[in-house]
Protein backbone atom coordinates (compact mmCIF):
# COMPACT_ATOMS: atom_id res chain seq x y z
CA UNK A 1 0.00 0.00 0.00
CA UNK A 2 2.83 2.38 0.83
CA UNK A 3 4.39 1.71 -2.55
CA UNK A 4 1.11 2.52 -4.27
CA UNK A 5 0.77 5.81 -2.36
CA UNK A 6 4.31 6.79 -3.28
CA UNK A 7 3.58 6.17 -6.93
CA UNK A 8 0.41 8.25 -6.74
CA UNK A 9 2.33 11.16 -5.23
CA UNK A 10 4.88 11.29 -8.06
CA UNK A 11 4.53 14.52 -10.07
CA UNK A 12 2.80 14.16 -13.40
CA UNK A 13 5.91 15.38 -15.21
CA UNK A 14 7.97 12.60 -13.63
CA UNK A 15 5.39 10.00 -14.71
CA UNK A 16 5.41 11.36 -18.26
CA UNK A 17 9.21 11.41 -18.25
CA UNK A 18 9.32 7.79 -17.15
CA UNK A 19 6.76 6.77 -19.74
CA UNK A 20 8.65 8.44 -22.57
CA UNK A 21 11.95 6.97 -21.45
CA UNK A 22 10.45 3.47 -21.28
CA UNK A 23 8.52 3.59 -24.52
CA UNK A 24 10.73 5.90 -26.58
CA UNK A 25 11.20 3.17 -29.19
CA UNK A 26 7.55 3.41 -30.15
CA UNK A 27 8.05 6.92 -31.46
CA UNK A 28 10.96 6.10 -33.75
CA UNK A 29 8.87 4.74 -36.60
CA UNK A 30 6.86 7.95 -36.78
CA UNK A 31 10.00 10.08 -36.87
CA UNK A 32 11.61 7.97 -39.55
CA UNK A 33 8.45 7.92 -41.66
CA UNK A 34 8.35 11.72 -41.64
CA UNK A 35 12.03 11.96 -42.49
CA UNK A 36 11.72 9.54 -45.39
CA UNK A 37 8.83 11.56 -46.80
CA UNK A 38 11.01 14.65 -46.54
CA UNK A 39 13.82 12.87 -48.36
CA UNK A 40 11.58 11.85 -51.23
CA UNK A 41 10.36 15.39 -51.81
CA UNK A 42 13.68 17.02 -51.05
CA UNK A 43 15.83 14.99 -53.42
CA UNK A 44 13.42 14.01 -56.18
CA UNK A 45 14.78 16.74 -58.43
CA UNK A 46 18.30 15.38 -57.99
CA UNK A 47 17.43 11.80 -58.93
CA UNK A 48 18.45 12.16 -62.54
CA UNK A 49 19.77 8.73 -63.42
CA UNK A 50 17.62 5.80 -64.38
CA UNK A 51 19.64 3.53 -62.07
CA UNK A 52 18.75 5.62 -59.04
CA UNK A 53 15.10 5.70 -60.00
CA UNK A 54 15.12 1.97 -60.59
CA UNK A 55 16.70 1.38 -57.19
CA UNK A 56 14.16 3.58 -55.45
CA UNK A 57 11.33 1.77 -57.20
CA UNK A 58 12.76 -1.60 -56.14
CA UNK A 59 13.05 -0.47 -52.54
CA UNK A 60 9.54 0.96 -52.50
CA UNK A 61 8.20 -2.32 -53.88
CA UNK A 62 9.99 -4.34 -51.19
CA UNK A 63 8.77 -2.09 -48.39
CA UNK A 64 5.23 -2.03 -49.78
CA UNK A 65 5.11 -5.83 -49.86
CA UNK A 66 6.42 -5.95 -46.30
CA UNK A 67 3.84 -3.42 -45.14
CA UNK A 68 1.00 -5.58 -46.47
CA UNK A 69 2.01 -8.60 -44.37
CA UNK A 70 -0.42 -9.52 -41.62
CA UNK A 71 0.58 -10.28 -38.04
CA UNK A 72 0.84 -14.01 -38.70
CA UNK A 73 3.24 -13.63 -41.61
CA UNK A 74 5.16 -10.45 -40.78
CA UNK A 75 8.19 -12.28 -39.34
CA UNK A 76 8.58 -14.29 -42.53
CA UNK A 77 8.03 -11.17 -44.61
CA UNK A 78 10.83 -9.40 -42.74
CA UNK A 79 13.15 -12.34 -43.31
CA UNK A 80 12.41 -12.16 -47.03
CA UNK A 81 12.70 -8.38 -47.30
CA UNK A 82 15.87 -7.90 -45.26
CA UNK A 83 18.43 -9.50 -47.63
CA UNK A 84 16.88 -7.68 -50.57
CA UNK A 85 17.15 -4.34 -48.79
CA UNK A 86 20.70 -5.06 -47.65
CA UNK A 87 21.70 -5.91 -51.22
CA UNK A 88 20.33 -2.59 -52.44
CA UNK A 89 22.21 -0.78 -49.68
CA UNK A 90 25.47 -2.53 -50.57
CA UNK A 91 25.14 -1.81 -54.29
CA UNK A 92 24.25 1.85 -53.78
CA UNK A 93 26.65 3.09 -51.13
CA UNK A 94 26.95 6.86 -51.30
CA UNK A 95 23.68 7.65 -53.07
CA UNK A 96 20.05 8.16 -52.15
CA UNK A 97 19.15 4.52 -52.80
CA UNK A 98 21.82 3.38 -50.37
CA UNK A 99 20.67 5.90 -47.80
CA UNK A 100 17.06 4.84 -47.86
CA UNK A 101 17.97 1.15 -48.04
CA UNK A 102 20.21 1.41 -44.98
CA UNK A 103 17.42 3.13 -43.07
CA UNK A 104 14.90 0.50 -44.16
CA UNK A 105 17.24 -2.30 -43.09
CA UNK A 106 17.73 -0.57 -39.75
CA UNK A 107 13.97 -0.45 -39.24
CA UNK A 108 13.66 -4.17 -39.96
CA UNK A 109 16.50 -5.07 -37.61
CA UNK A 110 15.00 -2.80 -34.96
CA UNK A 111 11.62 -4.51 -35.24
CA UNK A 112 13.47 -7.80 -34.68
CA UNK A 113 15.18 -6.32 -31.61
CA UNK A 114 18.58 -6.85 -33.21
CA UNK A 115 19.97 -3.68 -31.72
CA UNK A 116 23.58 -4.02 -32.85
CA UNK A 117 22.67 -4.68 -36.48
CA UNK A 118 20.11 -1.88 -36.43
CA UNK A 119 22.69 0.54 -35.06
CA UNK A 120 25.20 -0.43 -37.75
CA UNK A 121 22.64 0.34 -40.45
CA UNK A 122 21.65 3.67 -38.90
CA UNK A 123 25.31 4.66 -38.80
CA UNK A 124 25.85 3.47 -42.39
CA UNK A 125 23.07 5.81 -43.45
CA UNK A 126 24.99 8.78 -42.04
CA UNK A 127 27.91 8.21 -44.41
CA UNK A 128 26.12 8.93 -47.69
CA UNK A 129 26.33 12.27 -49.42
CA UNK A 130 22.61 12.88 -48.82
CA UNK A 131 22.92 12.19 -45.09
CA UNK A 132 22.32 15.83 -44.21
CA UNK A 133 18.60 15.22 -44.50
CA UNK A 134 18.61 12.34 -42.06
CA UNK A 135 21.84 12.32 -40.04
CA UNK A 136 20.24 13.64 -36.85
CA UNK A 137 17.51 11.01 -36.71
CA UNK A 138 19.97 8.25 -37.66
CA UNK A 139 22.33 9.22 -34.84
CA UNK A 140 19.34 9.44 -32.50
CA UNK A 141 18.24 5.93 -33.39
CA UNK A 142 21.83 4.68 -33.04
CA UNK A 143 21.77 6.14 -29.54
CA UNK A 144 18.52 4.35 -28.70
CA UNK A 145 19.99 1.07 -29.95
CA UNK A 146 23.02 1.68 -27.75
CA UNK A 147 20.73 2.18 -24.76
CA UNK A 148 19.04 -1.12 -25.51
CA UNK A 149 22.51 -2.70 -25.49
CA UNK A 150 23.27 -1.00 -22.14
CA UNK A 151 26.12 0.90 -23.81
CA UNK A 152 25.35 4.22 -22.18
CA UNK A 153 28.57 6.01 -23.09
CA UNK A 154 28.03 5.26 -26.77
CA UNK A 155 24.43 6.40 -26.49
CA UNK A 156 25.59 9.71 -25.03
CA UNK A 157 28.09 10.10 -27.87
CA UNK A 158 25.45 9.49 -30.54
CA UNK A 159 22.98 11.88 -28.92
CA UNK A 160 25.70 14.54 -28.98
CA UNK A 161 26.41 13.81 -32.65
CA UNK A 162 22.70 14.16 -33.42
CA UNK A 163 22.63 17.57 -31.75
CA UNK A 164 25.69 18.71 -33.71
CA UNK A 165 24.18 17.96 -37.13
CA UNK A 166 23.19 21.08 -39.12
CA UNK A 167 19.68 19.87 -39.92
CA UNK A 168 18.63 18.70 -36.45
CA UNK A 169 14.98 19.57 -35.88
CA UNK A 170 14.44 18.01 -32.45
CA UNK A 171 17.28 19.32 -30.30
CA UNK A 172 15.01 19.73 -27.29
CA UNK A 173 14.29 16.00 -27.22
CA UNK A 174 17.99 15.23 -27.55
CA UNK A 175 18.95 17.58 -24.73
CA UNK A 176 16.48 15.88 -22.43
CA UNK A 177 17.74 12.44 -23.45
CA UNK A 178 21.30 13.51 -22.71
CA UNK A 179 20.28 14.87 -19.33
CA UNK A 180 18.41 11.68 -18.52
CA UNK A 181 21.41 9.46 -19.30
CA UNK A 182 23.90 11.68 -17.50
CA UNK A 183 21.63 11.77 -14.47
CA UNK A 184 21.44 7.99 -14.56
CA UNK A 185 25.25 7.85 -14.53
CA UNK A 186 25.35 10.08 -11.48
CA UNK A 187 26.85 13.04 -13.35
CA UNK A 188 24.29 15.43 -11.93
CA UNK A 189 26.14 18.62 -12.86
CA UNK A 190 26.34 17.67 -16.53
CA UNK A 191 22.72 16.52 -16.47
CA UNK A 192 21.65 19.85 -15.00
CA UNK A 193 23.59 21.69 -17.70
CA UNK A 194 21.61 19.93 -20.41
CA UNK A 195 18.31 20.47 -18.60
CA UNK A 196 19.17 24.16 -18.13
CA UNK A 197 20.21 24.49 -21.77
CA UNK A 198 16.84 23.06 -22.76
CA UNK A 199 15.05 25.43 -20.40
CA UNK A 200 16.93 28.50 -21.67
CA UNK A 201 16.69 27.78 -25.40
CA UNK A 202 13.26 26.14 -25.65
CA UNK A 203 11.12 27.77 -22.93
CA UNK A 204 7.81 26.73 -24.50
CA UNK A 205 8.77 23.20 -25.48
CA UNK A 206 7.02 20.21 -23.90
CA UNK A 207 10.40 18.65 -23.08
CA UNK A 208 11.25 21.75 -21.07
CA UNK A 209 8.53 20.98 -18.54
CA UNK A 210 10.11 17.59 -17.94
CA UNK A 211 13.57 19.15 -17.67
CA UNK A 212 12.33 21.68 -15.14
CA UNK A 213 10.84 18.91 -13.02
CA UNK A 214 14.20 17.12 -13.01
CA UNK A 215 16.05 20.29 -12.02
CA UNK A 216 13.64 20.79 -9.11
CA UNK A 217 14.07 17.17 -8.03
CA UNK A 218 17.87 17.30 -8.24
CA UNK A 219 17.97 20.47 -6.14
CA UNK A 220 15.55 19.04 -3.59
CA UNK A 221 17.74 15.95 -3.28
CA UNK A 222 20.83 18.10 -2.78
CA UNK A 223 22.52 16.75 -5.90
CA UNK A 224 22.97 20.19 -7.49
CA UNK A 225 23.05 23.73 -6.16
PLM features: what roles do these ranges have?
Residues 1-35:
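N-terminal positive-inside, membrane-proximal cytosolic segments immediately preceding the first
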Residues 89-98, 112, 128-135, 162-171, ...:
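Short solvent-exposed coil/turn linkers within tandem alpha-helical repeat scaffolds
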Amino acid sequence: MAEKNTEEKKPLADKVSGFLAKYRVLFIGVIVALIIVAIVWGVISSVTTSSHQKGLNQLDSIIYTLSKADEASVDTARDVALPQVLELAEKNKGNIVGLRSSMAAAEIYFSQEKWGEARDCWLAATTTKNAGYTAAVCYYNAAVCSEELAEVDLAIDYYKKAISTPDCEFESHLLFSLGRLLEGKGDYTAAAENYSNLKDNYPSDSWTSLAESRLIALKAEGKIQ
